[in-house]
Amino acid sequence: MLYLIIALTVLISIKGFKDHSFFNKYKFNISSVKNGEKYRMFSSAFLHVDFNHLFFNLFTLLVFSNQILNELGGLYYIIIYIVSLYFGNYYTYKQYKNNGFYSAVGASGAVSGIVYSAILLFPEMKLVFILFPIPLPSYIFGIGYILYSIYGMKKLNDNIGHSAHLGGAISGIIITIIIKPSIIVSQTWLIFLLILPFIIERFIKK
């Protein structure tokens, strides 16, 4: 299932690189979704801006997917992927619904859901980054990245899909809890710390 997702994403992304009309037809766009083209909520996840964007998303997906596949199996893996994909774009839609020109592509929501599901299942998993070679527990990264995404979404000073990351992350967390409710007891504090920034962000917005 993982390699099928990767293959489809690569093939469709390459098609989008070469064919601008294809790219524009299937990318996420607020006005188009409002006009009934709901398929863009899904199709946009298989398109990417360039090879760097494509590589980063798929590399991240590869790093975190096996943990979920081994722990939960292929069916639950695809459920997490698809639900996170949709809600990453849905969260983006709600965030930018008054900006009809807003467009986005990429599997960021789906990948983010997989990443945060893996973090919830394996919070002590060590992560090593090129610019930060010291092994870091995944839960530290998870909390930090949510805070960074909320900050980035508020600042609106880059081209990163922070809202898709956030929507995908919260979806991945919730679906993982539904699939494996015992995690509420074993990871109570981690769940609280991961969800708290969303609650604060909603409260500040109001």
List each model region and its residues.
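A detector for small-residue-rich transmembrane helices and their helix-helix packing motifs
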Residues: 1-206
